[in-house]
Amino acid sequence: MSALDVYVDGVGLWSPQLADFESLRRVLDGQSPEPPARRPAAVVLPANERRRAPESVLLAAEVAGQAISMSGQDAATVACVFASSHGDQAITDYMCATLAEVPTELSPIRFHNSVHNAAVGYWTIATGCHAPSTAIAAQRASFGAGLLEAASQACSEQRPVLLVCSDFTGAGPLLEVTACTQAFGCALLLAPTRSAASVARLRLTLTNARPSSTLNPPLAGWRESNPSAAALPLLVQLVQGHGRCQVEAAPQLGLQIDMESVA
C-alpha cells in the first residue's frame, strides 16, 4: 500500500484525568490539570438523549464534538469512523447476567444500546449527519484499524473524515478478559488537504513490525488500562509537533505514523 498523507484539523480527548487535548499538553509540561466531571458532558446530544444514553455513548460524543469544534467543520456533512475494542462492556455484562438468570426481564432500551454502532447512531442522529458512517472493532488494534480506515476514506473520497476511538470501563467477568480499568476516548478530524485549521500532517505507512512506541508515566499506565489509549503516542506527537510512532492495526500489521507540524 502506498503511504497515506492526511492533515489533522481537530483533536478531541477525554479520560478521568484529561478533560480535553489541552489537558494532555499541560500534563506533558509537568502540570496537573483539573480532572473533568465524572460523566462526559457530550453537549452535542440533546438533553433527553444525554439522560438516557449510556456512558460509552457520552464518551464518544464528547470527544467527537471537541474535534469538530476545533476543526470548524459542519458535523452534518462529515463522514465518520467510530472504533471501539469492546463496545459497551457494562451493558454486555448486564445482558449476559440477565439472560442467564431472568431473560424475560431484559431491558429493550439497554438491548438497543448494546449494539457496537450505538455511538455512531446517536452521533449521526444528533448532528443530522447523512454522510457515510462506519463502526470498527479490532480488539487492542482498534485505534490503528480505525485510523487506517479513516485515512483511506479521506484520501480516496477527498473529503474530511472524523475518527472516534473510545472504550469505557469494563464490568463483571468481562473485566478479567478486557483489563479495561478506566475510560478513554479520542477523536481526530482528518482531511486530505491542508486548511487554515490544520495543525499537523500525518504520513501513514503499513509495516510488519510490532509497535514499539514508548511512553513515560503516567501515560504508559493509561495506555495499559484501555485499548483506545493506544492513540497516546500519536497524541503526544501532536503536542510536541513532530515525531514518529507505531500503532497496531491488526494482529500481524503495524501502522507507522510520521508527523510534522503545519500550524
Predicted features by range, described:
Residues 1-86, 90-110, 115-116, 120-133, ...:
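Conserved "HGTGT" condensation-loop signature of ketosynthase/thiolase-family condensing enzymes
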Residues 60-65, 137-161:
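Active-site-proximal alpha-helical scaffold in enzymes
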